[in-house]
Curated annotation (Swiss-Prot):
InterPro entries: ATP_synth_F0_asu, ATP_synth_F0_asu_AS, ATP_synth_F0_asu_bact/mt, F0_ATP_A_sf
Localization terms from the record: Mitochondrion inner membrane
UniProt function note: Subunit a, of the mitochondrial membrane ATP synthase complex (F(1)F(0) ATP synthase or Complex V) that produces ATP from ADP in the presence of a proton gradient across the membrane which is generated by electron transport complexes of the respiratory chain. ATP synthase complex consist of a soluble F(1) head domain - the catalytic core - and a membrane F(1) domain - the membrane proton channel. These two domains are linked by a central stalk rotating inside the F(1) region and a stationary peripheral stalk.
Protein name (Swiss-Prot/TrEMBL): ATP synthase F(0) complex subunit a
Molecular function in Gene Ontology: proton channel activity; proton-transporting ATP synthase activity, rotational mechanism
Membrane-topology annotation of the record: Multi-pass membrane protein
Lineage summary: Eukaryota, Metazoa, Chordata, Craniata, Vertebrata
Domain of life of the native organism: Eukaryota
Annotated GO CC locations: mitochondrial inner membrane; proton-transporting ATP synthase complex
Residue ranges of the TM segments: 3-23, 58-78, 87-107, 128-148, 169-189, 192-212
Reactions catalysed according to its record: H(+)(in) = H(+)(out)
Amino acid sequence: PQMMGIPLILIAIFLPTLLIYTSPTRLSTNRMTTLQLWLTNTITKQLFLPVNTPGHKWAAMLMTLMIXLLSMNLLGLLPYTFTPTTQLSMNMALAIPLWLATVLTGLRNQPTASLGHLLPEGTPTPLIPLLIIIETVSLFIRPLALGVRLTANLTAGHLLIQLISTAAFVLLPMMTLTALSTFIVLVLLTGLEIAVAMIQAYVFTLLLTLYL
């Protein structure tokens, strides 16, 4: 498949390389390297604001995860491509091990504080059993919420794009003006989906940092 004479397979192969930081071979950096450094530093600072210093060792892994999610989300908006992150199985395969790692790390390093989160301070005695059950359930629901949120947001956006593009294609021979207005809506929705793809990658990573 091609778009404006450009094979889409070339875009799918080379676009993610723009997000990967490569160490410059000389002292003066180019604009792309400067942009990569600025984005990496800005996002890392925002992600790790609520995390204490020992948790900063997760920075490299979580930034890699965010770039992987961002690449897959954006590449899924290209025609004739498939978005892996619209599959719940893949999102759960990412969410469950990372969530489990945060839980086990907390239990190993600060077992008392980790177990203390299951019972808020100042809880009335009659409510203690109920609150422990509620907090335990909410703890185990976290990976499901991560996976379902990412899947649902991307799937809903792709379905809307598919429906509106089909409507524009069907209306074109019958009502040209209506088809053109529908196409404008499609362009705006595509821009919104690009923003959603970026935001969802950021939110997925941000929630993992909050679980640390």
